[in-house]
């Protein structure tokens, strides 16, 4: 068999990432969509489809229907999220379908390019809006030192494969993993992954592993 070229590997890598991203946002109870750096919308959850996209056939069609000022504001927010220390930009009082929303845009850089996660929080729900803005101002955007050396294992690879990629011993990989799980109260990797996917903390970690594997 012929070895895949870099373009083919990048395409497969992007497909895996977008699939994981789609699964992660499907758990959320507020509208979320994902746009790639080329301006195309690649994912949305059910809440977005029902509350934001509504009668339009696609996210792109919905976005094209917005007023120019609104489109520029949201596109500019993507750019500003890239330069933000937390990778997040928040726009308040965006009027969509006669409802005011806070739109929180988070940028995630991967070897394939930038992905932008758009979160829509109903302004009338002050408690939820404040919680989400606070969460994405303080939550982990880049994996902490606690993950260094065991990143591949944390997202699903075996200790043997992970330790070989990270150039550490299997024993050290297991000890560091046990220490991390014990500190945060996880009895298994399954429970760890369940929590990470539901809270979307898996996304920056996944991007980090993609970077490691691409070296």
Swiss-Prot record:
Report if keyword Cytoplasm is assigned: yes
**Keyword Ribonucleoprotein in record:** no
Output the Gene Ontology cellular-component terms. Answer: cytoplasm
Q: Which InterPro entries match?
A: TraJ
Q: Which residues form a coiled coil?
A: none
Q: Where in the cell is it found?
A: Cytoplasm
Keywords of the record: Activator, Conjugation, Cytoplasm, Plasmid, Transcription, Transcription regulation
Organism domain of life: Bacteria
Tell me, in a sentence or two, what this protein's role is: This protein is essential for positively regulating the expression of transfer genes that are involved in the conjugal transfer of DNA between bacterial cells.
Report what the protein is called.
Protein TraJ
């Amino acid at each position: 068999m012929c070895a895949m070229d870099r373009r083919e590997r990048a395409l497969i890598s992007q497909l895996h990432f977008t699939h994981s991203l789609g699964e992660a946002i499907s758990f959320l109870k507020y509208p979320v969509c994902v746009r790639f750096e080329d301006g195309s919308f690649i994912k949305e959850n059910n809440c977005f489809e029902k509350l934001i996209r509504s009668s339009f056939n696609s996210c792109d069609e919905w976005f094209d229907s917005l007023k120019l000022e609104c489109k520029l504001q949201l596109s500019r927010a993507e750019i500003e999220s890239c330069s933000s220390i937390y990778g997040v930009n928040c726009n308040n009082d965006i009027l969509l379908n006669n409802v005011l929303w806070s739109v929180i845009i988070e940028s995630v850089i991967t070897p394939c390019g930038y992905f932008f996660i758009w979160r829509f929080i109903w302004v009338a729900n002050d408690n939820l809006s404040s919680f989400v803005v606070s969460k994405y101002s303080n939550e982990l955007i880049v994996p902490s030192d606690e993950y260094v050396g065991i990143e591949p294992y944390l997202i699903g690879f075996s200790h043997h494969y992970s330790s070989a990629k990270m150039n550490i011993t299997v024993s050290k990989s297991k000890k560091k993993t046990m220490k991390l799980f014990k500190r945060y109260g996880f009895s298994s990797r399954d429970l760890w992954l369940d929590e990470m996917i539901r809270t979307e903390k898996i996304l920056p970690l996944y991007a980090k592993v993609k970077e490691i594997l691409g070296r």
